[in-house]
């Protein structure tokens, strides 16, 4: 599983899986800026002392919800928090609040429409974290989810920061800071430097345009169109196995029912594997 995460590090940017990449150097004229636009404010400091990352590009919540459970079954919020799907979006905010909020934070949540009758002062964080604990492993390696940690470097040394809401302080509380701390996001992990790995706005990390997993999924799609369902499943499973996901055809949730079903599964696989 860790091999998936390590693909997007400088030491593996030219490994055998990378077929065609935009090659970058540690120089402002020969670089890419995903480290900044996909990042957060707890990346290493810029000349003014602020974290150099900006979360210009964030993860769509519907995309985050699309990640399967680890066993290949579909994720359903009601399995984690009964009644969640029937609640209004504003009311659901209560489940994303940090433990032991202050009176001011409570008043702000009420004003925003949160159903505070559902708030658990000592276990709110632990409850929402369960929604992300048993998912396709690529989710945790691609997305910073609520109350997950991120190894940042804004204070000059590597330090773990936690995605909490409402944000208070990255120095005193170790909260992960974003551009607009009044909002809570799903943030990117892929192509974002951890600790002090990528200390500049510009990044030397190569950007892959085509890698072997992409080839396998194209191959699977072609085989599926030729009605070779076993062949298509085999190619997709090569991708899923490396990531640590449940292989297709190995339990009740991963049985492929036909060509149309396989087409959708390949599309989903492309999303989860190639995000970023």
Language model regions located:
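Structured-RNA-binding interfaces characteristic of tRNA pseudouridine synthases
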Residues: 66
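Acidic/polar-rich alpha-helix caps and helix-coil junctions
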Residues: 1-52, 73-276
